[in-house]
């Protein structure tokens, strides 16, 4: 989506079918889902596929019905909804069916989802609309204020991936970034450091941590003790931000582990 957002000069209008974890454009979402179905399931005139769609916790009944509606409009026979945190936990290999507490934090593009699970169900869950997209905007705003230069969402995302970090380590990285000077209107290249990106993302990362803390505070004591012992598991694209596990661990006092394949959980 970030690459698509940067093609405005070609007279192409880029849209985000989903925003903050919910449907923003019904028609575009339907076409997107149809494309996924066509790529993964062989077409048949005799049968329609059954699909399972992961949804954020905390969405409204109206938003749930909108998701189901898109699923049926895309040509499916049955649509089943499941919470993203449950899918992420299973994908991360957590034993969610056992009589003990496990905690998953899924930091995606539009939302960060966190939950404590036990006996195959969700005991406590929270969701905030601060995740990868928000971090990209944080970087854009930081560059605008510090350098008086505007950069695109694609550049901001690449900066986050390449040199972004939640805490500083011994080796600080640098990256040349192309943008447009707000003073002259001309192209300009600036140099961003890991420290710049850390500072840009800090406030949003703190908000994610505060939501994790809130989830733990709402967790029954015996399950919270399990989480304290076994740790918190992180999934989603933003789980790959350098030192994010150390940052969350330092703020919560709990061991933090990154899922083996966080982007595909």
Segment roles from a protein language model:
Residues 1-107, 116-232, 239-265:
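Nucleotide/phosphate-binding catalytic cleft detector across ATP-hydrolyzing
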Residues 109-111:
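Short acidic, Gly/Ser-rich segments with clustered Asp/Glu that frequently serve as metal-coordination loops
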